[in-house]
Amino acid sequence: YQIPLELRNLPIIESALNPKAVSRVGATGLWQFMLATGKTYGLQVNSLVDERRDPIKASFAAAHYLSDLYKVFGDWNLVIAAYNCGPANVNKAIQRSGGSKDYWQIYPYLPKETRGYVPAFIAANYMMTYYSKHNICPMHSTLPAQTDTMMVARNIHLQQIAGVLGIDIEQLRALNPMYRRDVVPGATQPYAIRLPLADVNRFIEMEDSISNYRASELLTNRMQVEVNDDVPTYYHKSKRYVKSRKWRVTRRSHMHRGSKSKARRGKASHSRKRSKARSRRRR
């Protein structure tokens, strides 16, 4: 995408390099993609998989997005500002400044958070370049330096892999942060898992044993609420016929993808009560 190498340090101020980071407004992953932007750039998000949390896929998506922003603004400082507050806010700041496309000229018209964002990015780049001059020592990663990616075409739980291959479950989660519930839903479509290179051949040889290990316990089918499902559709999927006037889901306003809900029969209306009473009197 022909973007400056220094932009690799952007996740330092976005997420502190935490692939599972979630902001108060729902931005997720190393690059803090909002749901709509992530989907625009090809990142899959559902109740089991959130590719915004995949460091590799999210980095490709971020590079694509940053490249697109540069085509709009033609200045990397403005691109970085737009990455933080959105291109619409940067355009407003440009208009209020009289049409200038210099970051420091539009600085007073940017949102407060964004005014500190570009300086923070400059500071992060300085730190990553000159850390040794300030006696800053990098921490060594506890994750394996060499990994490989395997495509899986069946449902597998990370605990199945950990149990059979003897890999630490937290290490597996760190290598595969995109799986929100530790489930790789390969039966729906092939998904990739990352393993320490030393364990790849054993995984290939023992895949059937891994798939059968505690399968009934770890891969029990659970009904999930999809984002676009309304309540009657949700119960139709679970093979129950539901009429919305007879049933209601409690606290529906808090439902989201993957959430569980309770349903209870609503009280009969006064008109129905009166009609039932008249019916009994006629008998």
Label the predicted regions.
Residues 3, 18-22, 29, 47-48:
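Glycine- and small hydrophobic-enriched segments that form the cores of compact globular domains
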Residues 1-16, 63-67:
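Export/targeting segments at the very N-terminus of extracytoplasmic proteins
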Residues 11-14, 34, 107, 175-176:
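A general structural motif at alpha-helix termini
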Residues 21-42:
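Short, surface-exposed glycine/acidic/tryptophan-bearing loops
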Residues 1, 40, 45-48, 52-72, ...:
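Extracytoplasmic and endomembrane cell-envelope/extracellular-matrix remodeling and assembly machinery
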Residues 4-12, 28, 76-81:
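Alpha-helical scaffolds flanking conserved acidic
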